[in-house]
Regions:
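Conserved catalytic cores of very large enzyme subunits
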Residues: 110-573, 594-595, 599-772
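Well-ordered alpha-helical scaffold segments within catalytic/enzyme domains
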Residues: 586-594
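Charged, amphipathic alpha-helical regulatory modules used
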Residues: 2-134
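Core structural elements
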Residues: 60-61, 87-93, 548-559, 563, ...
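Solvent-exposed, amphipathic alpha-helical segments
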Residues: 64, 68-72, 496-504, 590
Length: 772
């Protein structure tokens, strides 16, 4: 009997999905079962991942399958591959391996979806059309080439990246995510941001703690960089760190306390300059043989600030007024040279971040820096010179796009006239009035102040230039800081669509059905939650060697402590999983006919809706012990995608789908005329609800450089209304010939030429010399 059954298996044919028959091979079944069991891991007492099951469990299921095949196919002589897979699932459930069954079943479903990409005619056509567009069209004609504003889709490397992006996105949809998530994205119910990076398991963005990175130097993968010894190398390595980390993430890079991190470089530079100046003066005066220069060097090495009383050197110069004067002169020159070097370092930093490329050379890093609160002499020198270098612009006077600088405003530090850094706040306003940057964050906003500890800059909330914010950590209540962490991924909900279906805009009802609205919103949030968790599992399945700079160099806190084969869950759990939304204004118009700037009723409802979303995110955090946050989505590209689909479904609805975009997040619509104060008062309460990130913009007309006081008054209004992060947009013209930046009407105020007119070489030279 046994021999007969063995003979049966030897003659048994397996029918593949394409109808082809192959000889039965039991080892393939064993391998498939083993993969299912291996996908389930447990943690030991040290938190290390170990296999939950052993070979006995695998063998138990395998032998059961073989017996069933022998029993059920004695006469047929053939068996379909789907039947074998059904048997495996059935036996896993029957024997109580529910977790293995779940993973095996989900993997099988994903494999089926991936096959559809290549065997489903409609999907194949759509995929090939996307590839065709990349190869034959310019960025002006093809949306895919414009998806990332920081990538030039018309360059060779930019196009290469877009090819990879298109294939990766389709692979993610067909193989890595459940069908319900990809369908919700394609239908326009949700938008999964940076889907093309999902297969790689990258995280979004990062707040880089440069002090930890600089302490013993770091490696970019092609060589080790020593600990920096002066401000020039500090700024150079800061740019290199940003560039290197950009290659390990799909979002932007931010530095939460740039002034604090650069300050030690200023002190090191000053000590070098001070030693050199004293040596040169003593040498010039033939006094080296009478003064113990080694003692002077030792005293200088003890300094912990560039501000000190020269009398500390009195035991060296004693009663000699001439030598004391040498010390004073050396100090003055050392300060001057240090200040000049710091300016050059900041200038180089700005130029580097606008010229150095990452990601196969297709883009410059999306970089942000937070600064403004370091009151030390060294920190103040960094802040001042960074602002001055921003004010000067790039090589031909262009306004630098990167880094997006964010000036942190804080009472007692820089907000009031008596505050030590008040002069730097004034300078920040002046520079922003000309160059659009810096933006301004407000540490006194209640939701930011809650984390602030005086004297501990690590408790100051840092923002990304794009608005992302990360502070609280439900997984570690003793470490509520920004640095060394980042956002994992975020997905946005099409809020107007839910509102259209349940509001009065379609004239199907006289009053909005809010009960069903909240039910649909809750269901959609649950869907996004599950999608974020699915992506989180992909991220956690990676290893430290997949992200050599982010993890192996310890940019993500404790990443350097991982072993090569460790999974990433214990680190990534400190990041944020973020739900976003778009078009609150259109949602309110769809529900009740007015948006939040038009009526108090609409504002009340708007806060209720976003409050509902925030509360649900907080509940997710408690349920999963992960940082679920709510972001006011930065949706410059997404806003057009959603409304385009909704317009096709519902037609043009006045105030809802009658424009080419949905209004960004909770913003008051740009077309709505209202006062600055009213706009800020309407938007401010939403900052408190969107703990994952937010920003409010104010648009100003005219030349703001001629009225910096008015510009500053808007910043103060932001602070007083409770805004967390704000920016002012205003027109900026630039004369390409003489480089003037400001408002240009008919005649350039600087060189006097009209549009199209030449300007003499002599005048240009005089203007250039005036700027030196």
């Amino acid at each position: 009997m046994v021999a007969e059954k063995e003979e049966l298996l030897e003659t048994l044919n397996v029918v593949k999905r394409n109808g082809k028959k192959v000889s039965f091979d039991g080892s393939k079944i064993a391998i498939a079962i083993k993969k299912g069991f291996d996908s389930v891991v447990a943690e030991d007492e040290n938190g290390e991942h170990i296999k939950k099951y052993n070979e006995k469990d695998i063998q138990k299921v395998y032998h059961s399958i073989i017996k069933r095949i022998e029993k059920e196919n004695e006469e047929n002589g053939r068996i379909k591959i789907e039947t074998i897979q059904d048997m495996i699932e059935s036996e896993l459930q029957k024997k109580g391996y529910e977790d293995v069954y779940k993973n095996f079943s989900e993997y099988r479903e994903r494999r089926n979806q991936s096959r559809q990409l290549f065997f489903d005619e409609k999907k194949t056509h759509k995929f090939l059309k996307s590839i065709e567009g990349l190869g034959l069209k310019s960025a002006n004609e093809d949306n895919n080439k414009r998806e990332n504003a920081n990538v030039d889709g018309d360059t060779a490397m930019g196009t290469m990246l877009q090819y990879g992006s298109t294939i990766s996105k389709e692979f993610a949809k067909s193989y890595l995510m459940k069908k319900k998530f990809s369908e919700a994205h394609d239908n326009g119910d949700i938008h999964i941001h940076d889907m093309d990076f999902l297969p790689m398991g990258t995280t979004t963005c990062m707040q880089i703690e440069l002090d930890r990175l600089f302490k013993n130097g770091f490696s970019t993968g092609h060589g080790h960089l020593r600990e920096p010894k002066d401000i020039m190398s500090y700024s150079s390595l800061a740019a290199i760190a940003i560039q290197s980390n950009q290659n390990d993430q799909h979002g932007g890079q931010s530095i939460p306390a740039f002034d604090y991190y650069m300050a030690p470089g200023v002190l090191k530079t000053f000590k070098k300059q001070f030693k050199q100046q004293i040596y040169d003066l003593l040498d010039y005066s033939d006094l080296l043989s009478f003064i113990n220069i080694d003692r002077i060097v030792r005293e200088i090495d003890k300094l912990n600030s560039i501000e000190f009383d020269i009398e500390i050197f009195e035991p060296i110069y004693k009663e000699s007024k001439s030598i004391k004067r040498m010390f004073e002169k050396s100090y003055e020159k050392a300060i001057q040279k240090t200040n000049r070097t710091t300016y050059q370092a900041m200038e180089a930093f700005v130029h580097n971040l606008n010229t150095m490329h990452s990601r196969a050379g297709a883009q410059v890093p999306f970089s942000s820096i937070n600064l403004g609160t370091d009151t030390s002499a060294e920190g103040r020198m960094v802040i001042k010179n960074f602002l001055l270098s921003t004010d000067a612009g790039l090589g031909k006077g262009e306004t630098p796009i990167f880094p997006v600088s964010i000036f942190k405003v804080k009472e007692g530090v820089n907000y009031n006239p008596e505050d030590k850094n008040y002069d730097l706040f004034k300078l920040a306003c002046k520079v922003s009035a000309k160059r659009l940057f810096p933006n301004f964050s407000f540490l006194d906003a209640p939701f930011n102040l809650a984390f602030y500890q005086e004297g501990n800059y690590k408790t100051e909330v840092g923002y990304m230039g794009c608005r992302t914010r990360l502070m609280s950590d439900v997984t570690d209540l003793n470490n509520q800081t920004t640095g060394g962490r980042g956002n994992l991924s975020f997905t946005s909900i099409n809020l107007p669509r839910i509102a259209i279906r349940n509001g009065i805009c379609l004239k199907e009802r006289e009053k909005a059905d809010m009960d069903n609205f909240y039910k649909e919103l809750a269901d959609m949030m649950d869907l996004v939650r599950d999608q974020l968790l699915e992506r989180f599992e992909v991220q956690c399945s990676k290893h430290s060697y997949n992200f050599p700079f982010l993890l192996e160099q310890g940019v993500w806190a404790d990443g350097d402590k991982l072993k090569p084969n460790d999974r990433l869950r214990k680190l990534l759990k400190h990041g944020s999983l973020t739900l976003g939304f778009i078009g609150l204004a259109e949602s309110l118009k769809a529900l009740i006919g007015k948006h939040h700037a038009e009526s108090e009723e609409a504002q009340k409802l708007g806060l209720e809706i976003i409050g509902f979303m925030r509360k649900r995110c907080d509940e997710y955090s408690k349920q999963y012990n992960l940082n679920f946050t709510l972001i006011a989505t930065p949706a410059e590209g997404l806003s057009g995608r959603f409304v385009g689909i909704d317009k096709a479904i519902f037609g043009k609805i006045k105030g809802v789908t009658d424009r080419d975009y949905y209004t960004n997040s909770f913003h008051v619509p740009v077309y709505y005329q209202t006062s600055i104060k009213h706009k800020l008062e309407i938007e401010a309460p939403y900052h408190n609800l969107t703990n994952g990130g937010h920003i409010s913009y104010i648009e100003l007309d005219g030349d703001t450089t001629t009225n910096v006081e008015a510009f500053e008054s808007v910043i103060r209004m932001m602070k007083e209304t409770g805004i967390g992060y704000g920016a002012i947009n205003h027109p900026v013209d630039r004369d390409p010939v003489c480089g003037y930046v400001g408002i240009i009407k008919d005649v350039c105020p600087r060189c006097g030429r009209k549009t199209g007119e030449p300007v003499s070489v002599d005048l240009l030279k005089r203007l250039e010399e005036r700027n030196r």
